[in-house]
Regions:
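A positional/architectural concept
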Residues: 18-48, 53-71
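Alpha-helical ds-nucleic-acid-binding substructure associated with the helix-hairpin-helix region
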Residues: 22, 54-55, 59-132, 187
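C-terminal accessory module of base-excision DNA glycosylases/AP lyases that mediates lesion recognition
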Residues: 1-33, 117, 121-122, 136-208
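A general alpha-helix detector
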Residues: 44-49, 65, 81-85, 123-127, ...
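Structural motif
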Residues: 35-43, 90-94, 183-190
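Alpha-helix C-capping/helix-to-loop hinge sites
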Residues: 33, 48, 52-53, 69, ...
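Short alpha-helical scaffolding segments that buttress acidic/His motifs in well-ordered protein cores
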Residues: 45-50, 99-103, 142, 193-197
Length: 208
């Protein structure tokens, strides 16, 4: 796992703190902030599948059980699994199918991680959502935790919706359009803003 702070992190924190009192307070509250990545694009995407539409705590528990069933959480191993191999892990049948399809894409070369470094955010998202089960939210989680891109604002994320509603809208959860408009104030550091808003809901460091 890469636990080194992204090169842009300190500047982003300084800019956000100067512009937004809510984020200034959160950044000061969590000075140990590290946006870590797992260093393995397949595992990062697989974790994002597991975490779709459930809490971080639940996702961590399911991932631990899933990893325990695999000799190695790698494309060649996961591609050979069937639903029976994963009974009791807490994964839905659909998520099992998605994980196997993702593994096949890596295993046969239809996904080539080397190309992502030269692609902008929207190009990476477009490539990823061509994979079965990967929607925009999953692709955005990969941009944040896999590529550690600085300006990702996942408007479909439940935690981000809750935090923005709590801090900026008097407890009212915003619509996707409202959240999209709100995010413009945090550009070009929306990943960092997202990460601290997540921390406000769960003081444990968010990882995928």
């Amino acid at each position: 796992m890469n636990t080194r702070q992204p090169h842009y992190w300190k500047r982003a924190c300084a800019d956000l703190s100067a512009q937004d009192p809510v984020l200034a307070s959160l950044i000061a509250r969590y000075p140990d902030a590290v946006l870590a990545d797992r260093g393995d694009p397949f595992q990062t995407l697989a974790r994002a599948f597991v975490g779709q539409q459930i809490s971080v705590k639940s996702a961590d528990s399911i991932w631990e059980r899933f990893a325990a069933r695999c000799a190695s959480v790698s494309p060649d191993v996961v591609a050979r699994l069937d639903a029976g191999d994963l009974d009791g892990c807490g994964l839905s049948q659909r998520k099992v199918e998605y994980l196997r399809d993702l593994a096949c894409h890596f295993d046969d070369g239809r996904i080539d991680p080397l190309g992502w470094q030269s692609m902008d955010d929207e190009a990476v998202i477009a490539e990823l959502i061509a994979v079965r089960g990967i929607g925009r939210w999953t692709a955005e989680m990969f941009l944040i935790f896999g590529l550690r891109r600085p300006d990702v604002w996942p408007v479909d994320d439940i935690g981000l919706q809750r935090a923005v509603g709590m801090f900026y809208r008097g407890g009212e959860r915003p619509s996707a359009q409202m959240l999209r408009e709100h995010g413009t104030r945090h550009a070009p550091w929306r990943t960092v803003a997202t990460w601290y808003l997540w921390r406000s809901l769960d003081p444990m460091v968010v990882q995928y």
